[in-house]
């Protein structure tokens, strides 16, 4: 069973992008390969409970358990030793990825305070898109009363697009609300 976004991609987006960019094969059409959610937790050095709460939040948002990222090397200025847990990360692919993107675009983004659209300039030059979320409470799975602190997260959308223009057209076809 495919999700709403998967069906939309196969039925409408592929045809639109072929006419817009003149691809010769269906396999040339850019597609989203993975979505990575990353939460950096610098304040977890002092309190170990922060990691548990962040992992719980990411699990609710993503629908799968994140991996705890550890410090690669010691940095005395930040009071970090090698191997310290300093973040949490989860990679979504396939059906879970499309379900997350659907919830993100239709439910979470409109709940952002003073939302005027997302920047169209956050592409990396190779067709991938990054967006930072300041508060995890924009996701409906997170209950406002049960959180201990407001935490932001970075969402990286990796595509097979060769250029930023192709990637922007792909994400715009998925109803991403770009402001420029």
UniProtKB/Swiss-Prot annotation:
In terms of domain of life, where is this protein from?
Bacteria
Q: Which Gene3D superfamilies match?
A: 3.30.1440.10
Keywords, ordered alphabetically: Ribonucleoprotein, Ribosomal protein, RNA-binding, rRNA-binding, tRNA-binding
InterPro entries tied to this protein: Ribosomal_uL5, Ribosomal_uL5_bac-type, Ribosomal_uL5_C, Ribosomal_uL5_CS, Ribosomal_uL5_dom_sf, Ribosomal_uL5_N
For the keyword Ribonucleoprotein, the answer is yes
Q: Does the keyword Magnesium apply?
A: no
The task this protein performs is described as: This is one of the proteins that bind and probably mediate the attachment of the 5S RNA into the large ribosomal subunit, where it forms part of the central protuberance. In the 70S ribosome it contacts protein S13 of the 30S subunit (bridge B1b), connecting the 2 subunits; this bridge is implicated in subunit movement. Contacts the P site tRNA; the 5S rRNA and some of its associated proteins might help stabilize positioning of ribosome-bound tRNAs.
Q: What is this protein called?
A: Large ribosomal subunit protein uL5
